[in-house]
């Protein structure tokens, strides 16, 4: 399956496919942002499989860089998939996810169905 845009309750969401380029470094962020802008999406839903492990290791600061860039460009981000193993290893990540899910710009959801219900 390819990346696609899906309209969910008035929100244009770029739903990234499970397979494809990984977001592995700060330089990769622009690829996802560019595609969102090109397709006029206001939210990007990225599966866990498309994120490098460093995203979940907060000490690498990759997650912070991703979040900052999305916020700066006024795009919302949803991370889709099971991150329970990562949360079990890191209290800081658990707190980060909990705080993100309280907000409006960055969400972590189990799957696209959960994202649909939140929007």
Q: Where do the model's predicted regions map?
A:
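Amphipathic, Lys/Arg-enriched alpha-helical "gate/interface" segment within cytosolic domains
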Residues: 2-119
């Amino acid at each position: 399956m390819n990346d696609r845009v899906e309209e969910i309750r008035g929100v244009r969401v770029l739903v990234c496919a499970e397979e494809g380029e990984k977001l592995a470094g700060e330089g990769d962020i622009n690829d996802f942002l560019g595609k969102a802008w090109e397709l006029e999406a206001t939210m990007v839903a990225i599966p866990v499989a498309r994120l490098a492990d460093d995203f979940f290791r907060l000490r690498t600061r990759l997650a912070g860089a991703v979040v900052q860039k999305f916020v700066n460009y006024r795009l919302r981000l949803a991370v889709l998939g099971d991150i329970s193993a990562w949360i079990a290893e890191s209290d800081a990540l658990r707190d980060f996810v909990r705080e993100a899910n309280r907000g409006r710009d960055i969400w972590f959801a189990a799957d696209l169905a959960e994202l649909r219900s939140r929007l």
